[in-house]
Amino acid sequence: MAKISEDAHQITGLTPYVPETMPKANTYKLTNKRNPAYQKNVVYFSTCANRAFRQNQGYDDTRSLQQVFESLCDKAGYNVIYPPHIENLCCGLSFENYEEIDKQALADLTEALTKASEGGVYPIVIDHSACFNHAFKHIKGLKILDISEFLYTILPNLNVTKCNESVIVH
């Protein structure tokens, strides 16, 4: 695909170039993960970009971000709850310059997060910092956490094996 798009781009100057490193579509289905033995719950709002794409090719771990998050929550003893109709939800940041669309996106997200968190009983994790910031500024009355903040809080519940490898933190 990359070679074809590059050749077409060079010939016509009109066709977009699709690089080899372009992330592939994320086909992972988001469903609640509940274990009756777990007493703790977390609402996970996976953002538009992270729902649309999986990680770049070339990594040993081919799981989606959602699968990794679910795995860490499982190891820490947390049930994972997705907001209803997550595929239609957006924090509104992309529409910030379109006030009515931004307000509607935030209203829809607030309603879904309120329902999923049972009125704010459970913490809500957002997996993209810019989207977290936008939601955090505009949604009141719910405990909204950036994914890194939540992972820091569950770290004591995880058995972490040190490794001598390079890791990427984004």
Task: Describe each model-derived feature in a short phrase.
Residues 1-170:
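Iron-sulfur cluster-binding electron-transfer modules in prokaryotic oxidoreductases
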